[in-house]
């Protein structure tokens, strides 16, 4: 952002939009905007029609549960979120081994490969995209039927970003979260 601002004229209108407003975004706003007008929407007013389901399972039970849910729901498009690049690739590999068409999207991929993965997913070459949070930032898929949190997010705002990938453009969506005993504290259980 700073590189872009450096090339912008001194006299300009700068608009900044964010679904959440963590300290990092507030700091950017302070650097690039003068006397900004903040418009906040009450989070309950902004909620899209997302059905959330929660499944308690062991860590080893997550893959079989994911397979059962993909077979049950038969989504034409689904994003599965993992917390690490290693888990992301591992889940993708297992899904492909059992005949699910899956692609992985994480930070170890070159930008060219990430772009190619997104194009392949968008054109329906694969039904499942297994992704890390960072790689999926800004991901906008118009008709994403299902989001699965294979692992619970460390931060509640990340959870909101994840499930917000579904239920876009007036569509409803389904978000499923898995929780192993070691993740229970993050689920406020």
Model features per residue range: what roles?
Residues 1-189:
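Conserved helicase RecA-like core
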């Amino acid at each position: 952002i700073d590189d872009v601002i450096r090339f912008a004229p001194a006299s300009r209108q700068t608009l900044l939009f964010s679904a959440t407003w963590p300290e990092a975004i507030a700091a950017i706003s302070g650097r690039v905007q003068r006397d900004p007008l903040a418009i906040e929407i009450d989070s309950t007013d902004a909620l899209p029609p997302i059905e959330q389901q929660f499944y308690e399972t062991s860590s080893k039970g997550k893959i079989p549960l994911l397979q059962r849910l993909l077979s049950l729901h038969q989504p034409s498009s689904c994003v599965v979120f993992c917390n690490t690049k290693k888990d992301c690739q591992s889940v993708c590999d297992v899904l492909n081994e059992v005949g699910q068409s899956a692609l992985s999207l994480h930070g170890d991929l070159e930008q060219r490969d990430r772009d190619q993965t997104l194009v392949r997913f968008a054109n329906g070459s694969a039904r499942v995209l297994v992704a890390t949070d960072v790689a999926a930032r800004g991901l906008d898929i118009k008709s994403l039927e299902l989001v699965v949190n294979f692992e619970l997010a460390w931060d509640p705002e990340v959870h909101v970003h994840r499930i917000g990938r579904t239920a876009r453009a007036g569509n409803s969506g389904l978000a499923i979260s898995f929780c192993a005993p070691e993740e229970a504290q993050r689920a406020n259980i």
